[in-house]
């Protein structure tokens, strides 16, 4: 079994499943349709091109840094200023970091790995306004999808890891249910299952439709990578004096009430 791991991080992400008209919601983790769209863009496929080979890939994601939901109240007017366009609420995930994995044929994954490093079309995290930071591709792993997501070092930002340095961090895993079933986990390690309508039949605007998949929720205890003993910057990066730490841990967050009043998933 071969797995391609992806690092999905950026200032903003938005992974819509239920977005309609003036409300553009986001899920709290990357969707399979969003990742397939990113892969298709990387290899240079048009919206009308077939995606059956990409649909065969099995998908899972680990929430290394969940981020928080923010809302953009979006207004627009015509060029002459005489007519207002419909108002919209657009939701995003801010400061989130995810580890995603796709499992499938090695030859296909090798091509996708290369394409993500040199994409044909620009990559984005759900919406065109959400470019990723690099690297996106973390390369191939010769193991199963569940094991790959469990074993990879924690990708969270240093400020987030510092907030959890005294307590273990259990990251949420969301995987295609068939992956978990094949792993034959004990019953006590199994998680809740829900349906997700994020399997694209096609990206063709003339017949765009989505199917359901079953997603199982697990957890994985993660830890930061061991520092390189030969890295002269290691001591500096581990400096206990972080001038931003108090801001990052600020109890007064003006967005909290907004998020609670406008849940979107």
Q: For the regions a protein language model found, what residue spans apply to each?
A:
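Internal, well-folded beta-alpha domain core
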Residues: 64-265
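Glycine/small-residue-rich interface belts in oligomeric ring/scaffold proteins
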Residues: 2, 17-81
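Short polar catalytic/cofactor-binding loops
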Residues: 8-14
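Structural motif
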Residues: 12, 58, 97-99
């Amino acid at each position: 079994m071969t797995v391609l791991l992806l690092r999905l991080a950026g200032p903003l992400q938005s992974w819509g499943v239920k977005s309609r008209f003036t409300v553009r919601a986001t899920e709290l983790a990357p969707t399979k349709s969003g990742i397939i769209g990113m892969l298709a863009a990387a290899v240079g496929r048009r919206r009308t091109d077939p995606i059956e080979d990409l649909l065969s890939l099995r998908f899972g994601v680990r929430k290394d840094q969940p981020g928080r939901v923010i809302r953009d109240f979006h207004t627009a007017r015509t060029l002459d200023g005489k007519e207002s366009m419909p108002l919209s609420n657009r939701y995003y995930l801010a400061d989130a970091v995810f580890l995603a994995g796709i499992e499938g044929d090695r030859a296909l994954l090798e091509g996708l790995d290369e394409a993500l490093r040199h994409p044909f079309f620009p990559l984005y995290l759900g919406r065109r306004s959400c470019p990723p930071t690099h690297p996106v591709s973390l390369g191939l792993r010769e193991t199963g999808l569940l094991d790959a997501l469990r074993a990879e070092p924690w990708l969270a930002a240093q400020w987030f890891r510092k907030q959890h340095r005294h307590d273990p961090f259990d990251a949420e895993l969301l995987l295609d249910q068939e992956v978990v079933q094949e792993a034959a986990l004990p019953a006590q390690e199994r998680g809740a299952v829900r349906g997700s309508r994020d399997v694209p039949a096609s990206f063709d605007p003339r017949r765009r439709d989505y199917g359901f998949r079953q997603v199982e929720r697990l957890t994985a205890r993660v830890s930061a990578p061991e520092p390189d003993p030969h890295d002269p910057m290691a001591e500096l990066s581990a400096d206990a004096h972080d001038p931003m730490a108090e801001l990052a841990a600020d109890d007064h967050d003006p967005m909290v009430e907004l998020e609670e009043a406008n849940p979107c998933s």
